[in-house]
Amino acid sequence: MRLALGVSYNGQAYQGWQSQLSRQTVQDQLEMALSKLASHRVSTLCAGRTDAGVHGLMQVIHFDTPLDRAPNSWVRGTNALLPRDIAVEWARPVPPEFHCRASALSRRYAYILLESPVRPSIDAGQVGWTFKPLEQVAMQQAASHLLGEHDFSSFRASACQALSPVKMLQRLDISRHGACWRFEFEANAFLHHMIRNIMGCLITVGQGKKPPEWLKEVLLARNRNVAAPTFSAHGLYFLGPRYAPHWGLPDRTPAFDRLP
């Protein structure tokens, strides 16, 4: 049978999602726990790989197993074997044609940014940080230039392995919650470092260093060198994919409520 799992994790201690020789990744920790619980080697696929330091609120994975167990037993059993900063939120049986990556309609991320004269301490690793005040209207005007289908080469990491730089950015919402800003992104897919590179540009505009129209110039240049530096990974959260209703999978977890 094929199982889909929703997984949340704090990415601070890990070298990203994808398995590495060091085995200090979220995928490695999850597969070790699942393999021990299932008493057979479990290999997983995920909806979207995250970099070192990036957090996940609802990463979706799938794997195949000959075992027929109740979904809750997979949740409780796997969590008993996982480190405290990784948790399985839910488990669902899915048809064999379901694929956590290929079946996704879109992917969602949030970036949480603290605006404060003092760097974060209690929230260290959980939020990005800027000590200069930001102008919301200017950032929203700049963000509007990125909506729709574009070549996002200017926001692409040099190591990006995507076959095409053309992506459809469906949503980029900017809101303020006390001392924190929340930037929420939704697209069919994202390039490597795309969100962090966009964040660097939005903050540049928000601080008044560049006008909102500058972001359109950066986009059209299709040249990474004209954009702002890549922003910190600390405040980036993978909110998870969206799927068509017929798959019967959740589109959020209780972890969503803990973000500003």
From Swiss-Prot:
Its EC number is 5.4.99.12. InterPro entries: PsdUridine_synth_cat_dom_sf (IPR020103), PsdUridine_synth_TruA (IPR001406), PsdUridine_synth_TruA_a/b_dom (IPR020097), PsdUridine_synth_TruA_C (IPR020095), TruA/RsuA/RluB/E/F_N (IPR020094). The keyword Isomerase applies. Keywords: Isomerase, tRNA processing. The active site is at D51 (nucleophile). GO terms for biological process: tRNA pseudouridine synthesis. One of its GO terms (molecular function) is RNA binding. Pfam families: PseudoU_synth_1. It catalyses: uridine(38/39/40) in tRNA = pseudouridine(38/39/40) in tRNA. Substrate binds at Y109. Homodimer. Formation of pseudouridine at positions 38, 39 and 40 in the anticodon stem and loop of transfer RNAs. Belongs to the tRNA pseudouridine synthase TruA family. This is tRNA pseudouridine synthase A. It comes from Albidiferax ferrireducens (strain ATCC BAA-621 / DSM 15236 / T118) (Rhodoferax ferrireducens). The lineage of its organism: Bacteria, Pseudomonadati, Pseudomonadota, Betaproteobacteria, Burkholderiales.
